[in-house]
Swiss-Prot record:
Function noted in UniProt: Squalene synthase; part of the third module of ergosterol biosynthesis pathway that includes the late steps of the pathway. ERG9 produces squalene from 2 farnesyl pyrophosphate moieties. The third module or late pathway involves the ergosterol synthesis itself through consecutive reactions that mainly occur in the endoplasmic reticulum (ER) membrane. Firstly, the squalene synthase ERG9 catalyzes the condensation of 2 farnesyl pyrophosphate moieties to form squalene, which is the precursor of all steroids.
Annotated protein name in UniProt: Squalene synthase ERG9
Subcellular localization(s) per the UniProt record: Endoplasmic reticulum membrane; Microsome
The organism of origin for this protein: Candida albicans (strain SC5314 / ATCC MYA-2876)
Membrane topology reported for the UniProt record: Single-pass membrane protein
Length: 448
């Protein structure tokens, strides 16, 4: 009831919920051969592990849909081994380091997880995943195997790192490296898939996948900031000591010591972590501008707009220190609908960067740095899509630069998607208007 009342108090979000579930048409509806039992089961496993990821994966272009699904399940299997504290290190570490070799087999399974491990079924039925994996194009198999090797060894290294296990993340450099292994490598693998399928520009692979890495780091850092309290309850934390030690001697004190001074210190720490995460935004916008397939674009864009909205929510927010802070469900629906084109994504980023800037307090130690960073990002958004009304009257066209070339190269793609969006809006508005007129007519009939 509370969520329904919340929606009623935000009518734009209420309309977004109705439009998303009633009128939005996926670009590529997920159609599968019901007789292909292994493939059907793999998608069932995908839904069991993550319904949100399953929803966006199932709408991908058929060329990449199965490859991305298998990529996700393989990494989920790897993560399930790494997370399970009931598996002895003598078994876990060799298994992580050699997990990529299991992809050479066709019937390998693993039943060594604890009975309460949430995603143990993925490993128990790994032979079904292998069956579909071996049907993928060899190039797609190689990409999945390569990332599995890198991630498995990265996980094993962290398990053996006593300093990390005892004291957590030490420096900002360590923070970046940890996020790279957890999320940046996923971006690298997906980028290789996009480029190989001709869905993304080849320049996405330049500079050792720097832009793809930023995409992953931006998401992971946002989650790490948001999950402070939850991670603390699990006896761990990923906030880098190099940052939090400026504000407290013990990281737990932000939650335990309930004084105005400690709360201010905790919020200041959150804000510096947000500042650090914002350093990846321009790379993320660059990356998205170079993804040309509409379904792949949405697949990449949705998590990014959720992340920037979440950053705006956690910024300068003491609630992060004592519980979970999330964006509203209605906001989520609105962001999904509005992030299907590059202009839509740029508009969303600009909106939430302005929210962050307006929430800033002059008392914050990083007030000026945050203001400068937000200004830089807003300016970057303006460079991609300038406000033509603000241009001098004498300037009839924009001078050519990298942004005008990128926008021009994808204009037909975004316009095609925009037409679909406008049709959805029209259909939704007509139905809502009709329902509203019917309700008013009934009220009039009853009263008069």
């Amino acid at each position: 009831m509370g969520k329904f009342l919340q929606l009623l108090s935000h009518p734009i979000e209420l309309k977004a919920v109705i439009q998303l579930f009633g009128f939005r048409q996926p670009l590529h509806p997920g159609k599968r051969d019901v007789n292909d039992k292994e493939l059907v089961r793999c998608y069932e496993l995908l839904n069991l592990t993550s319904r949100s990821f399953a929803a966006v994966i199932e709408e991908l272009h058929p060329e990449l849909r199965d490859a991305v699904m298998i990529f996700y399940l393989v990494l989920r299997a790897l993560d399930t081994i790494e997370d399970d504290m009931t598996i002895k290190s003598s078994i876990k570490i060799p298994l992580l380091r050699e997990f990529d070799t299991k992809l050479n087999t066709k019937n390998w399974t693993f039943d060594g997880n604890g009975p309460n491990e949430k995603d143990r079924t993925v490993l128990v039925e790994f032979d079904k995943i292998l069956n579909v994996y071996h049907r993928l194009k060899p190039q797609y198999q190689d990409i999945i195997k390569s990332i599995t090797f890198k991630m498995g060894n990265g996980m094993a290294d962290y398990i053996l790192d006593e300093e990390f296990n005892v004291n957590g993340v030490a420096t900002v450099e360590d923070y970046n490296l940890y996020c790279h292994y957890v999320a940046g490598l996923v971006g690298e693998g997906l980028t290789n898939l996009f480029v190989l399928a001709n869905f993304g520009d080849k320049t996405l692979t330049e500079n050792n996948f720097a832009k793809a890495d930023s995409m992953g780091l931006f998401l992971q850092k946002t989650n790490i900031i948001r999950d402070y309290h939850e991670d603390l309850q699990d006896g761990r934390s990923f906030w880098p000591r190099e940052i939090w030690s400026k504000y407290t001697e013990n990281l737990q004190d932000f939650h335990k010591v309930k004084t105005p001074a400690k709360e201010f210190a905790g919020v200041s720490c959150i804000n510096e972590l947000v500042l650090n995460a914002l350093g990846h935004v321009t790379d993320c916008l660059d990356y998205l501008s170079l993804v040309k397939d509409p379904s792949s674009f949405s697949f990449c864009a949705i998590p990014q707009v959720m992340a920037v909205a979440t950053l705006a929510e956690v910024y300068n927010n003491p609630k992060v220190l004592h519980g979970v802070v999330k964006i509203r469900k209605g906001t989520t629906c609105r962001l999904i609908l509005e992030s299907r084109t590059l202009p839509g994504v740029v508009k969303i980023f600009k909106e939430y960067i302005q929210v962050i800037n307006h929430k800033s307090s002059v008392r914050d130690p990083n007030y000026l740095k945050i203001g400068i960073k937000c200004g830089e990002i807003e300016q970057y958004c303006e460079m991609i899509y300038p406000n033509k009304q603000a241009l001098p009257p004498s300037m009839k066209s924009l001078p050519e630069n990298k942004f005008t070339k990128i926008v021009a190269s994808r204009e037909s793609i975004d316009l095609s998607v925009q037409r679909r969006i406008e049709q959805e809006n029209f259909n939704c508005n007509v139905v809502l208007f009709g329902i509203g007129a019917l309700i008013l007519s009934l009220i009039y009939f009853v009263l008069y």
